[in-house]
Amino acid sequence: MFNLIQNFLSDLLQRTVIKVSLIEIKAIKNLLIRTFLKNYQIEMDDYPRKSHLDYKHFNDFFTREIDPSKRPIDDNHNSLISPVDGKIVEFGKIEEGRLFQIKDMHYKLHGLLDGNQTLTQNYENGSYISIYLAPYNYHRVHAPIKGDLKMANMVPGEMHRVDQNALSNIENLYIKNQRLITEFNDSLSDCIMIMVAARNVASITHKEINQNYEKGDEIGRFNLGSTVVVLLPNDVQAEWDHHVSIEKDVKMGEKIAQLSKIK
């Protein structure tokens, strides 16, 4: 009974957040945006629409576009770029089918990929990086490599928070939460990018599959959310850039690794 009540309240909160974020009444949406800007001390220099008056509703503001000149895309063909603005949570090798959620806490690759055995085999002993998007970050998600978007599979799940406290206390957090699994194919390297939803995430949107995207092209948006996990297969060597470290802030478009085929 307790779980039913908890789920009902969670769903009610979710629906309420969605409705509030889409309110177009100027007095309300302007108050919401101004309050958010003040609380998170957000500088709008990187965004074409700099005033709270320029946005239709709060979600329009939250998923605001960025000035492309402020996020140059690394043009090295063999580079992996950060798909988002955020903070690096973990990165490294996928070993024994496990990834670090946070220090001393693992989760299973098989579960993260929703039980897809073929993908699990291809990415076992590969590499990964997880990046957390705070509420004040830019919330559009971009292609980390050039390639064809072959899959976009939405996995239903819960809506736990994904901040530091949640990562430390909720086992298998990324597996439990709703997430969008996308797969890119390219001659140099395949790549999986997983967009993990969080509490108060209204939705995750994504672009069309079976299309070719350049590195840095917009692929999706968090309409109030969360974390991105990038996976590289076991036939690709990832040489992480010197600035890549846990708790390091990264910007969309900057190089985070050099990729090469393992012969």
Regions found by a protein language model. Name each.
Residues 1-263:
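Contiguous, well-folded functional domains in the mature portion of proteins
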